[in-house]
């Protein structure tokens, strides 16, 4: 499924490569769609890290620290040095959505955005509208997702490759951008949060 997508993969070829019995696959999964669903769940949940995902409830008195922790979790989850299986599945689903796209969104992306939204809501002024709050969250989430999804293109642009920039530096850059965005949106954020490590 990773190399050929839902439409391009055949159960027969998968069974041949996995040295598995087609009858057993049909018995346990019943259909190609169900098998694909289980594979996708495994890929996303194995890399999900939802148990370690920072949430406001973990440190409600320090929402800015929780935002920085969430950004670190998010960047390290989606920006590995080599192409990630999760990003490959996301690219395939965007290009040719399977019947499971909504479930993928619900199980992975939506849960992390909801956790981010709680944190961001605790940082921004109470007068911030729901639309503004959502926009801030999408702008914090988006650059990392885009970089992960476009990784095959980014590696082919001379002079714009991510190179050997340490993941810690990428995380800190994303944290500063996120904090600056919220400060521009009216959040009171001390300059100490913008200091480079």
PLM segments and residue spans:
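Helix-turn-helix
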Residues: 3-34, 38, 42
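Generic alpha-helical structural context detector
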Residues: 37, 41, 45, 72, ...
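Hydrophobic alpha-helical connector segments
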Residues: 52-84, 133-140
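Hydrophobic/aromatic-rich alpha-helical bundle segments in the mid-to-C-terminal region
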Residues: 87-89, 102-110, 119-175, 186-197
